Amino acid sequence: MSIREQWLENKAFYERRFHAHKFISYLQTYTNTYMSLEQFQEIVLAAADDPNLVGIAISTRPDCVNDAYLEFLAQLKQSRNLDIDIELGLQTVNYHNLVEINRGHTLAEYIDAVLRIKRCGLSTTAHVILNLPGDTELDVIETAKIISVLGVDFAKLHSLYVVGGTELGRRYEAGAFTMISLQEYVERVVTFLEYLDPEIVIQRLVGKGPQDNLLFCNWDTSWWKIKDAIDAEFIARNSKQGSKFDYLNGKALRLKNSRNKG
């Protein structure tokens, strides 16, 4: 089915089922800029003429962001009055773990992509995984800090899921690593959000894995139970997103001046 056909079919479904009137075209699966510029333009424009389209969201990798593609999107945004967002898979700022999980890019490529996107006047979403084997709470905190410093607009959280028949699946079945507990994951999510800029919009707290061949996903717990646990942890801490967002603009100097005034 062509992109245009997918757009028309899904639009009709949401109009009928949810009485929706405005839509965002979401190019999610795989790396949506890993193609020629001409192919990319054709795919993006498949829904661009729809008068009910208000935005386009494009998922891709940090090492597949190029100025020519961004300039096309910036022009489209201006000419069609659309919100355009680029969703990047960061996962973690832990350089060693990015290598270990074979991401194929490092933190540098992510930073470069975000800066280029922002220069073109587009928004960006950070996709992060807070329970990667080898990551600690310090990695979680630093991930929140880097995202905040870069002025990312949106964030999506997803726990790690393991699919059979993959290298990660083989390592999991061999006992090469273990997953943290659900409670520890909940605590990491809350800590991450405490250090995150409160202006960053959370698009997703809990994700789902594919239906088939899963070895591990969400501790075999319903997504809404995980969400409720996150809410409960916030209440227990009497906390909220951004409660520890105090580390920018020369924190050490501000603390020194505060002590001197005291």
Regions found by a protein language model. Name each.
Residues 1-10, 14-37, 52-65, 82-109, ...:
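Core AdoMet radical
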Residues 31-35, 62-65, 131-136, 163, ...:
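Short, small-residue-enriched loops and turns at beta-alpha junctions
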Residues 44-51, 56, 83-86, 144-150:
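Alpha/beta enzyme core
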Residues 37-45, 66-77, 98, 140:
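Distinct, well-ordered alpha-helical segments
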Residues 2, 35, 39, 101-109, ...:
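Alpha-helix N-cap and loop-to-helix initiation/capping positions
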Residues 108-167, 183-206:
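Conserved C-terminal portion of the radical SAM core fold
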Residues 14-18, 43-51, 71-83, 115-119:
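Acidic (Asp/Glu)-rich catalytic clusters
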Residues 154, 162-262:
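Auxiliary Fe-S-binding modules of radical SAM enzymes
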